[in-house]
């Protein structure tokens, strides 16, 4: 398989208001389905969105830093341990990627609560197409996980499996349960899955110091950062 890379045009940054971003995208002459090749790209800081594999390649900004949890060293804090215990009653099931109207309804409500007037909160056919393209298109080893409470859907995760870990693509959850901490529980659960499957890393995507949306990732310690093409620890994570 021949693999090449292209640089996109500049576009408004999703995380830092007023900034312009660019991405380097993977271009292949065939469908990228080899797990080892995909794992190498993830290890180099790439992420997946639908069939698109990319990493930031901005002119002057280097704020997007790939991070991962070394699961054997992960030490949950007191708050995380409480959240873990609180949600042990959730019914969790693994599925192949598929469209379900109940999942889509939860996704829409989550988007509208978090990203009002965003490009992903459309409830028409175009919105369903964006949902499928963003979450349900994959040529790698991907699966969908549902979390139910008393037969009510509470959370959905799309996750890629790698030879050396798990890489969550996207998670959305019930926005009308205040203080649920579903997102924190989800990372704790994925960390536990890595440990159970003897996978050393949970890849969390990008951490950005000046983005409040990304601050939660620094709550999971220790955390490794990809800096100058080397995975390393930092003495200051916040």
Swiss-Prot record:
Q: Which domain of life is it from?
A: Bacteria
- List GO terms (cellular component aspect): cytoplasm
Q: What InterPro entries does UniProt report for this protein, alphabetically? A: Acyl_CoA_acyltransferase, Asp_Glu_LeuTrfase, N-end_Aminoacyl_Trfase, N-end_Aminoacyl_Trfase_C, N-end_Aminoacyl_Trfase_N
What is the reaction catalyzed? N-terminal L-glutamyl-[protein] + L-leucyl-tRNA(Leu) = N-terminal L-leucyl-L-glutamyl-[protein] + tRNA(Leu) + H(+); N-terminal L-aspartyl-[protein] + L-leucyl-tRNA(Leu) = N-terminal L-leucyl-L-aspartyl-[protein] + tRNA(Leu) + H(+)
Q: What is its EC number?
A: 2.3.2.29
Localisation: Cytoplasm
List the SUPFAM superfamilies: Acyl-CoA N-acyltransferases (Nat)
Pfam families attached to this UniProt entry? ATE_C, ATE_N
Q: Which UniProt keywords apply?
A: Acyltransferase, Cytoplasm, Transferase
One GO MF term on file is: arginyl-tRNA--protein transferase activity
Q: Name one GO biological process term.
A: ubiquitin-dependent protein catabolic process via the N-end rule pathway
Principal location class: cytoplasm
What NCBIfam families does the record point to? Answer: PRK01305.1-1, PRK01305.1-3, PRK01305.2-3
* Database matches in HAMAP family: Bpt (MF_00689)
Q: Which family is annotated?
A: Belongs to the R-transferase family. Bpt subfamily.
Name it.
Answer: Aspartate/glutamate leucyltransferase
Supply the source organism for this entry.
Nitrosomonas europaea (strain ATCC 19718 / CIP 103999 / KCTC 2705 / NBRC 14298)
């Amino acid at each position: 398989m021949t693999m090449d890379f292209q640089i996109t045009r500049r576009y408004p940054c999703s995380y830092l208001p007023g900034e312009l971003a660019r991405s380097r995208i993977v271009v292949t002459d065939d469908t990228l389905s080899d797990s080892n090749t995909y794992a190498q790209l993830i290890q180099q800081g790439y992420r997946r969105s639908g069939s698109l594999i990319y990493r930031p390649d901005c002119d002057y900004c280097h704020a997007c830093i790939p991070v991962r949890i070394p699961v054997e060293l992960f030490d949950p804090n007191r708050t995380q341990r409480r959240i873990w215990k609180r949600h042990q009653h959730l019914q969790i099931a693994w599925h192949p990627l598929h469209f379900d109207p109940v999942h889509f309804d939860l996704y829409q409500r989550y988007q509208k609560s978090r990203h009002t007037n965003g490009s992903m909160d459309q409830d028409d056919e175009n919105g369903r197409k964006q949902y499928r393209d963003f979450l349900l298109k994959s040529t790698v080893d991907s699966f969908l996980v549902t979390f139910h409470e008393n037969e009510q859907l509470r959370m959905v995760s799309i996750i890629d499996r790698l030879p050396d870990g798990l890489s969550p693509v996207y998670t959305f959850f019930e926005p009308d349960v205040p203080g649920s901490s579903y997102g924190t529980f989800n990372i704790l659960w994925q960390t536990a899955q890595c440990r159970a499957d003897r996978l050393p890393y949970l890849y969390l995507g990008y951490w950005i110091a000046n983005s409040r949306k990304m601050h939660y990732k620094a709550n999971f310690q220790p955390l490794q950062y990809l800096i100058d093409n080397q995975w390393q620890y930092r003495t200051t994570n916040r």
